[in-house]
Amino acid sequence: MGSMAFHKSRLFLTFGDASEIWLSTLSHLTRKNYASGINFLVSLEILDLSETLIKAISLDHSESLFKIKSLDVFNGKVVSEASKQARAACYISFTKFLYRLTKGYIKPAIPLKDFGNTTFFKIRDKIKTESISKQEWTVFFEALRIVNYRDYLIGKLIVQGIRKLDEILSLRTDDLFFASNQISFRIKKRQNKETKILITFPISLMEELQKYTCGRNGRVFVSKIGIPVTTSQVAHNFRLAEFYSAMKIKITPRVLRASALIHLKQIGLKDEEIMRISCLSSRQSVCSYCSGEEVSPLVQTPPIL
């Protein structure tokens, strides 16, 4: 079968088939969010998962985006602008995938830029995630250490390395370099690409990790029966520590990371240094907390927090 005929034959896939293929190429969190987005588009009757992709050739993308952005109430609930933009992003990303899948037979959606009808625009300058002070997270960690030593180490790595929870839970013992007090993290980039970043940690924290792993191989953070730790297990122990330490806000891995970022800004670290440590993509991303090409492994040494 010729190449052109092969790509044209993909038009006989259903939207449901194509969406499953697309979602399988995404990272866990993105897949979860976009799966919800696809269901939303189906509920709005923008997509019919039983239809073949032939219908996509005649789809009016502008009308679809307008329908998403014009929605004020869905299932009895007010739809926020952030939610509308997230659903629009899902639709655009999906059509771009269909464009690649069919080698151009299906045209991708393009964000609207008409005055008063723009698909994407800045909603807020600040990240809504709450934060705590260094003194507060110190108290929280004291409680967490008693509740669960493993999750105490996870929390310390989040704060000290400015890392996301999934980056920590995916660590393997061969990512730990005790001789140099460094840890190699795999950072997910766009289009499922990965890069690595080497971060130097305080000797005391690395010694605690060495005692915890005790020479075993495989995943660093495991349960009592040796299986990888889940985010729900960490969340449960965080809630207990939050209660015992009498925190005024809900403490999540996201809150800890945001708190560490804000603290670095407060102690005078430059935006460029914070970007290198945290892997944030822009100064705007850094500032929002406070007022694609793969490269060689990066080495960062954040200040001791």
From Swiss-Prot:
Record GO biological process: DNA integration; DNA recombination; establishment of integrated proviral latency; symbiont entry into host cell; viral genome integration into host DNA
GO molecular function, one term: DNA binding
Superkingdom of source: Bacteria
UniProt KW keywords: DNA integration, DNA recombination, DNA-binding, Plasmid, Viral genome integration, Virus entry into host cell
Catalytic residue positions: K188, R257, Y289
Stretches assigned to the Tyr recombinase domain: 127-305
Domain Core-binding (CB): 13-99
A UniProt-annotated Pfam family: Phage_integrase
Record carries keyword Thylakoid: no
CDD domains per UniProt: DNA_BRE_C (cd00397)
Similarity annotation: Belongs to the 'phage' integrase family.
Further details from the record: pGP7-D is required for growth within mammalian cells.
Protein name: Virulence plasmid integrase pGP7-D
